[in-house]
Amino acid sequence: MAAKIIDGKTIAQQVRSEVAQKVQARVAAGLRAPGLAVVLVGSNPASQIYVASKRKACDEVGFVSRSYDLPETTSEAELLELIDTLNADSTIDGILVQLPLPAGIDNVKVLERIAPDKDVDGFHPYNVGRLCQRAPRLRPCTPRGIVTLLERYNIDTYGLNAVVIGASNIVGRPMSMELLLAGCTTTVTHRFTKDLRHHVEHADLLIVAVGKPGFIPGEWIKEGAIVIDVGINRLENGKVVGDVVFEEAAARASYITPVPGGVGPMTVATLIENTLQACTEYHDPQGK
């Protein structure tokens, strides 16, 4: 069996086009365009690349994008003060603080300071709690983007055995909640899991997010499984690969996401969707 490739680039572009049309309709009706504030502290090269892609996506769909590039020496108090200012700004619908933050700044304190209805990354405990209670509002971007991919490919998830490899706050844990909502019987594995291979071999839907190149051998994949590879790893030769051995896995799976061009583009597309949702549902619903 040769797996069908789940093309995240194409789906992400569709999502962005849909958002752009809705923004045009808002502006044509005399309403304001959604506003996103992107905050970067320091000069981490990877963070700069991610932030640039988010700003570009904002411009593409017609959002008002505001950039705050702060020096590495910024104090926690200064960053919290900026967030308070943005929380009070009625033209800003979403606040994104790029992680990781420099040493000496408490990530949790910063993320919790963002108003929940402007938390377009979906990391605030309020939004994670809403997802856990089956009443989601703004949802964590990567897990929600993965669900969108499955939906757009008309993959019926109800009753599937889903296995999530990795239990991070950003992907693994919220992903497990999304999968429960999608009707899956869900297992989350982590560094203390015994006999990882056994879990992988029984997965109808496998989602891998550990950040280790080739961590899951293709021979572990169940015939006909759906494989979602969240990993983005750059090898010494410059090649970008996922957490799953792609060629071997693609020979056994029914669907698989490539790296790059699978999950990555969906994370930014979902951020854009969340910002539009924050604007239209919480801040400026039809200009009321």
Swiss-Prot record:
GO MF entries: methenyltetrahydrofolate cyclohydrolase activity; methylenetetrahydrofolate dehydrogenase (NADP+) activity
Pathway assigned in UniProt: One-carbon metabolism; tetrahydrofolate interconversion
EC number(s) per entry: 1.5.1.5, 3.5.4.9
Catalytic reaction equation(s): (6R)-5,10-methylene-5,6,7,8-tetrahydrofolate + NADP(+) = (6R)-5,10-methenyltetrahydrofolate + NADPH; (6R)-5,10-methenyltetrahydrofolate + H2O = (6R)-10-formyltetrahydrofolate + H(+)
PROSITE patterns assigned to the protein according to its UniProt record, in alphabetical order: THF_DHG_CYH_1 (PS00766), THF_DHG_CYH_2 (PS00767)
Keyword Hydrolase assigned: yes
Annotated residues for binding of NADP(+): 166-168, 232
Biological processes annotated in GO: L-histidine biosynthetic process; methionine biosynthetic process; purine nucleotide biosynthetic process; tetrahydrofolate interconversion
Keywords: Amino-acid biosynthesis, Histidine biosynthesis, Hydrolase, Methionine biosynthesis, Multifunctional enzyme, NADP, One-carbon metabolism, Oxidoreductase, Purine biosynthesis
Superkingdom to which the source organism belongs: Bacteria
One of the Pfam families matching this protein, by short name: THF_DHG_CYH_C
Gene3D superfamilies found in the cross-reference section: Leucine Dehydrogenase, chain A, domain 1, NAD(P)-binding Rossmann-like Domain
GO annotations of cellular component type: cytosol
Subunit-level organization: Homodimer.
Matches recorded under HAMAP family: THF_DHG_CYH (MF_01576)
Protein family membership: Belongs to the tetrahydrofolate dehydrogenase/cyclohydrolase family.
Role noted for this protein: Catalyzes the oxidation of 5,10-methylenetetrahydrofolate to 5,10-methenyltetrahydrofolate and then the hydrolysis of 5,10-methenyltetrahydrofolate to 10-formyltetrahydrofolate.
Protein's name in the database: Bifunctional protein FolD
Source species of the chain: Salmonella arizonae (strain ATCC BAA-731 / CDC346-86 / RSK2980)
Gene: folD
